[in-house]
Amino acid sequence: MPSPQLVLLLPKDSYRNEDFLTAASRLGVDVIQAKNQCHQLADYWGLEQMLALPFDDPQRAARMVREQLGDALPVAVLGVDDQGAEVAAAINQILGLSANTPEAVAQLRDKYRFRKLQMECRLPAPQVVPFAGDEDVSAMKLPFGFPCVVKPSRLSGSRGVIRVDMSDQFVDAVDCVKTILRHEASVAESSSVLVEQYLPGSEHALEGLMVGGRLRVLALFDKPDPMEGPYFEETIYVCPSGLRAEVQSSFEQQVETVCRHAGVLEGPVHAEARIDGATVTLLEVAPRSIGGLCARMLRHTLGMTLEEVILHHAIGQSIDPAPASTGATGVMMLPVEAGGVFDRVTGLDAARAVPGVESIEITARKGDRVQPLPEASTYLGFIFASANTPDEVTATLRQADATLGVVINPLLGVDTTVVS
């Protein structure tokens, strides 16, 4: 019996590519790699089984897949990030494959449309105001006071998200977000600037899989570090969550509700929420899995990799993840604290020797130009740890991080060391 064939949309600079390809190999899935790379370069490099597609033009990409594969249609086309999810939806629709529609995916990917979706579902949501690029920001009257949050409608994670505490910071924050969008070609035309109420409370995340319109929760994460701004730097994720059962249930129900209402009925979802007392307010629900290398922390929780879970579902195989171990696990994302040219991370041997540390992956490469938030779109690396409790995991991650030093060369060429 032939292996199921799957088209994977792999951004050329994604952390996740290798983990998805490894999972596919382990499951015996025949993968056709599709990348946003030049056709001529792909041929020159001798990349086999690869489609070079324009990820910024989903309709054209879908036509190219049909032309190149002919009647040998795959069982599914799967994206591994935000942009890939939208492209995959368009390709699946044109090929007649069963999947979430492009409209369903777009409703979740756009943060303004997501807020309207929450309101339609009568779920807690902050007030939000969109505005056009030519609007006089200094004359803008908000229906709510400070603090507020300025953010782009279509960038992922914390990129371009800025807390504003007083009126004289407002114009600068909006200008900053506009500048970020001008330099982000993939969303520049389709993204707007949003201003919304700041939400107090702790921040948490959910990893799940929609199966037949029902949410299957794979993990709930706590974020021990306060996310209060002015920029919202992701650092530590730990699980299992310490949230009360009724709060967890509210979080899960809200995620399922908005997914069903949008029409996202199948596939991975990653959700973020603010929790203030018993009130759960979703920040976003993305039709993709968790970003970076963070998924690696879930192998203990699931008994297999998250990528294997996603691929099992994509090819129509039922799954029953079984935890490989009890206890707690976590990841720390190493943020960029100074802009410049990345050189190296020091203290790695000492950090890896901290009891409970499982691995440290430095993903930045020597010579990479790096930027801190709000412009940042990448991390320097990831620390993974496990222990008996989430608190112990958090302490382990902090101890390992404290031994590291980051050397970043300013663009002028003078070395500077940033110690975590």
What are these regions (language model features)?
Residues 118, 143-164, 182-201, 206, ...:
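ATP-grasp fold ATP-binding core
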Residues 124-127, 147-150, 164-200, 231-237, ...:
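Conserved ATP-binding module of the ATP-grasp superfamily
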